[in-house]
Regions:
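Membrane-embedded helix-loop-helix hairpins and adjacent transmembrane boundary segments
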Residues: 1-520
Length: 520
């Protein structure tokens, strides 16, 4: 679907691209960076920087396009993925992050090395690199290539390569701090354009009352009956936590943002801030899809809901901002993935075989970023040949990767008795089981009707692996290092007590309880 752009729209896009590169080059020239600067932003990030950076990384093209599609076809039920996230952000802030900072880690695999030993560490290094390359980079480039080619009528692979080159350039130049600062800039663009689009669509419909009356009644139900084939309350309440624990508490691309916090307090408030932003996300991402259903239900496919609203409702000038928002969401997702891949590969792979000073690590990190971008283009090409939509691919990939990591990290943080051998059995054996199951699921083998919903599949795999780690733990003897975490760096602690943070989470919980009641 081609979107006709005027000169003013191209001017807006040009200003956006220039601003993006200015931020990257400016940060590179300001000062000589140390190892922590390029990989963890110098561990100086404040709560609002962390929150906006998490928002922009999370609000990728999948959210803008996928959530509008979900709103068009299903209604508010997709809001569950946003309005339940606060529980797992709370877990990250109050339970996982203190332990991560105490250990002084730079990457998530380093935590497993301290908790469960070298073999678990080796597994997660490889697993993290594969997950970043496939889930964050390959799928994002594929989705972004589809968007760019659809808007500008360019060939798909040319669009994918353009996105990869642009994101890799300012990521390699500026490191994590450039990713964070461009993330703040891009968060503002995404929120502003989404609010504008929502307001224009609501105005076109005739207001909130017209929207309520124009969509089917079940579009306003947040938790659907257990018999619902698509998004039953059982699938969401049981399956989403499996994915969310991995995504919010153990994924390198997400956790790296809070590891870069100035201190524990800033990291905790950053997680609280993004949890609060989650309240508005369905209003500006899912509700526009519902409005598109009212306006164009007989002529539009769900996957085209966002682009359709942009094409038909947004005037020139503002149209450039909305297209910039799509590109911003795409760029930040890709740049976050590139920086995370570079961090893990440089610090957990290259540093094991070669002694490097900060300057050497920085040079290596830049080259790894460029190499990761090239590999991701190849993965995106394979996705383009798979015959499946990018939304289906991303859902399947996350549900495959989540169960073993969710089990091992929960045990590692909350169960001191869990042993190294039990973690290794779940990671290596469970990882192979999940990957094999996921491949069969994606290929619909032995048949499409054989497989449950992808969230329920995650639950079943999680329960099997949870039982496995318990059984192996009780039949194996703990090693001397099991459960020990030796701090590697001095981490600044927040002054005073933790009650202000807990008060913030309590207020948020009450607000979310009211929202659940409203859409029950």
């Amino acid at each position: 679907m081609n979107v006709s752009l005027a000169r003013v729209d191209y001017l807006v896009l040009l200003v956006y691209v220039v601003a993006l590169f200015f931020i990257g080059f400016y940060l590179d020239k300001r000062k000589k960076k140390a190892n922590a600067d390029i990989f963890l932003g110098g561990r100086t990030l404040r709560w609002w920087q962390i929150g906006f950076s998490l928002f922009s990384a999370n609000a990728g093209p999948m959210m803008l396009i996928g959530f509008a599609s979900l709103g068009f076809s299903q209604g508010v039920v997709g809001s569950s993925f946003e309005w339940l996230a606060w529980i797992f952000l709370l877990m990250l802030a109050m339970f996982f992050l203190p332990l991560y900072l105490k250990a002084g880690i730079t990457t998530i695999p380093q935590f497993l090395q301290l908790r469960f030993g070298q073999r678990s560490y080796n597994f997660l290094v490889i697993y993290s690199l594969i997950s970043i390359l496939v889930v964050w980079l390959g799928s994002a480039l594929y989705a972004g290539g589809l968007i760019i080619s659809q808007v500008f009528e360019w060939p798909l692979m040319r669009s994918i390569i353009l996105v990869a080159v642009t994101a890799a350039s300012f990521t390699a130049i500026g490191g994590l701090k450039a990713v964070v600062r461009t993330g703040i800039f891009q968060s503002v663009i995404i929120i502003l354009s989404s609010v504008i689009l929502t307001w224009l669509a609501l105005k076109k419909i005739g207001g909130v009352e017209s929207l309520v009356n124009a969509v089917p009644a079940d579009y306003w139900t947040l938790f659907r009956p257990a018999t619902d084939p698509e998004y039953s309350w059982v699938a969401i309440l049981a399956g989403y936590p499996v994915v969310a624990i991995y995504y919010w508490c153990a994924d390198q691309t997400i956790v790296q943002k809070v590891l870069a916090a100035k201190d524990l307090k800033e990291g905790q408030y950053g997680a609280l801030f993004i949890a609060g932003l989650k309240i508005i996300m369905p209003l500006i991402f899912i509700f526009p899809g519902m409005m598109c259903f009212v306006l164009f239900k007989d002529t539009v496919r769900p996957d085209n809901a966002y682009i359709t609203l942009v094409k038909h409702l947004v005037p020139h000038g503002l149209l450039g901002i909305c297209i910039a928002a799509l590109i911003a969401a795409l760029m930040d997702t890709v740049s976050s993935g590139l920086n995370s891949f570079s961090t893990v590969f440089t610090l957990d792979v290259v540093s094991r075989f070669r002694v490097m000073d900060d300057a050497a690590r920085r040079r290596t990190g830049k080259w790894v970023t460029l190499a990761a971008a090239a590999l991701a283009v190849g993965v995106a090409y394979l996705f383009s040949r798979s015959g499946k939509g990018f939304f289906e691919l991303s859902q399947g990939l996350v549900s495959i990767l989540a169960p073993p990591l969710s089990v091992v990290f929960l045990a590692g943080v909350f169960w001191k008795r869990a042993t190294s051998i039990a973690a290794e059995v779940v990671l290596y054996g469970g990882g192979l089981i999940c990957i094999a199951t996921g491949i069969c699921h994606l290929l619909n083998f032995p048949g499409k009707d054989f497989w449950p919903h992808f969230l329920l599949l995650s639950v079943y795999l999680f329960l099997i692996l949870a039982a496995l780690i318990v059984i192996v733990t009780f039949v194996s003897s703990p090693a001397a290092a099991d459960g020990s975490l030796v701090p590697q760096a001095t981490v600044a602690r927040p002054a005073g007590r933790a009650w202000p943070v807990w008060l913030g989470w309590t207020i948020l919980a009450l607000v979310m309880g009211g929202i659940y009641s409203l859409f029950h």
